[in-house]
Amino acid sequence: YCGSRLSDVTEGNLYTVAFPMAEENNGNGTVAPAFALPGSTPWRTITVGETLKPIVETTVIWDVVEPLYETEHDYQMGRGTWSWILWQDGSINYDDQVRYVDLAAAMGYEYVLIDNWWDTKIGHKRMESLIDYAQGKGVDVFLWYSSSGYWNDIEQGPVNKMDDPIIRKREMKWLQEQGVKGIKVDFFGGDKQETMRLYEGILSDADDHGLMVIFHGCTVPRGW
C-alpha cells in the first residue's frame, strides 16, 4: 500500500486522509495503490501532543502491527562515529575514515558509518582493507548507499545499487563477504506504493545477508 498523510485543511475546517502527491518520485509511479483480494488496508494513526515528546516517544505504529517477517539473524544495535556530520563530503577519504575508526575504538563504540561518495573517493577494493582495519580495532562498518532508481537524479554514490533486486543482492553479497554490518540508504522519492515496496525489498534482502538498515531521507515510520 502507499503511505498517507493528512490533507490541507478543507472547507469546514476538516482534514482528510490523502494519498501521495503526483509529483513525488519525480512524477513517476501511481498515486492510487492497488492490491489483490482478499486484502486489507493499513492502520492509520494520529498522535497528538502539546509538545514533541509524545510524538517522538509513541510506539503506536509498532503496537498495531503484527510482524510479517521473522529475521534470520540476531542484530546488535550500538553506538558509532560518523565523520560526515562534522566534516561532510571532504571527510570521505581513507585517512579520515581511519581516524574515525580509531575514535570509535577509543570511545568503546561498536560502529563507524562511512557516508556518501565512498565508492569513488575510497573505492571497493580499498574499502576492503579499511574494513579489515576497522575489524582489527573491534569496530564494525556501516556503508552509505543512494536508493537510486529512475525517480532519483542525485549525484552522490554509490548509485543504482539498491533499486534493482538483482544488482542489490549482488552488492549485499559483497557486503556480507566483507563483514559489513549494515547500510544507510538515503534519498527516497516519496510515499507511493512503488517506494513502499522498495523499502520492504531492501529490508528483506538485507536480512538475507545479515545487514542492519538505516533509512535516511525517507518516510516516517510505517510499522517495520
Model-inferred region functions:
Residues 20, 24, 79, 109, ...:
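Amphipathic, alpha-helical segments enriched in basic
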Residues 1, 43-48, 78-83, 97-103, ...:
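Long, contiguous hydrophobic alpha-helical segments, chiefly transmembrane helices and signal peptides
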Residues 28-32, 66, 97, 168:
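Sparse, context-dependent recognition of short Cys/His-centered cofactor- or disulfide-binding micro-motifs
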Residues 37-111:
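An acidic-aromatic substrate-binding cleft motif
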Residues 1-61:
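N-terminal accessory beta-strand-rich subdomains and adjacent acidic, glycine-rich linkers
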